[in-house]
């Protein structure tokens, strides 16, 4: 994102993806009006709400292909996802994304796929929790380096709201197996230090029978201050 923004402001900058290097020459940087697109990862949690409960539209979302891989997994599950109004603003691809309540089916997510959607894994797990059949997310060893407790936190949160989630680990394979339930029961959830796990659990509570609370909601508020206020709406800009 920084390279794109610098180019927009007049920088003579070249990005070589083959060597993963950036070459920037002395340049005259000029100020300009900048449009900041919506964060895709945050949008995914609202979209998960739409897939489980009804129509949700997220507007002006950044849709850089390196960030949107989780949508392919959603679609493999049978999710009704539509991307509209694609355009470029300040060098960034943005669009509006619509998610509608869907009849979801279980899938297998390989460890490489899981690593590529690391930031969206809790949201993916929550929609798997109401899919038909048993889904599996394999754990890539690099995920342990990024967040050693993530899969344990996802499993605990899902069980807290009445989901059927089993953590497995052996010398040959590790991950979580999620068997879909018709509806989450609800309950109180501790998200620890993971805002994404807390956000996913909050989505589950909105579609649960009894509701519940995120006991350490301040963790979510610190990272996404508007999340709790807007949860339950059906349009986000």
Language model segments and positions:
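Short, structured segments at the rim of ligand-binding sites
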Residues: 1-237
């Amino acid at each position: 994102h920084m390279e794109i923004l610098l180019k927009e402001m007049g920088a003579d900058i070249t990005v070589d993806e083959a060597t993963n290097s950036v070459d920037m020459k002395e340049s005259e940087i000029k100020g300009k009006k900048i449009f900041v697109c919506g964060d895709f990862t945050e949008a995914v949690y609202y979209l998960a709400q739409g897939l489980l409960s009804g129509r949700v539209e997220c507007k002006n979302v950044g849709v850089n292909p390196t960030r949107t891989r989780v949508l392919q997994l959603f679609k493999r599950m049978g999710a009704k996802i539509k991307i509209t109004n694609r355009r470029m603003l300040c060098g960034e691809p943005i669009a509006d994304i619509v998610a509608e309540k869907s009849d979801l089916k279980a899938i297998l997510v390989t460890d490489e796929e899981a690593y590529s959607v690391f930031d969206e894994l809790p949201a993916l797990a929550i929609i798997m929790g109401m899919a038909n059949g048993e889904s599996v997310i394999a754990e890539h060893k690099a995920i342990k380096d990024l967040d050693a407790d993530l899969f344990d936190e996802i499993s605990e949160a899902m069980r807290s709201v009445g989901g059927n989630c089993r953590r497995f680990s052996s010398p040959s394979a590790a991950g979580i197996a999620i068997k879909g339930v018709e509806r989450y029961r609800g309950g109180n959830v501790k998200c620890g230090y993971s805002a994404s796990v807390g956000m996913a659990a909050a989505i589950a509570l909105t579609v649960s029978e009894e509701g519940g609370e995120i006991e350490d909601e301040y963790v979510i508020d610190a990272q996404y201050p508007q999340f709790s206020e807007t949860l339950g709406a059906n349009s986000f800009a």
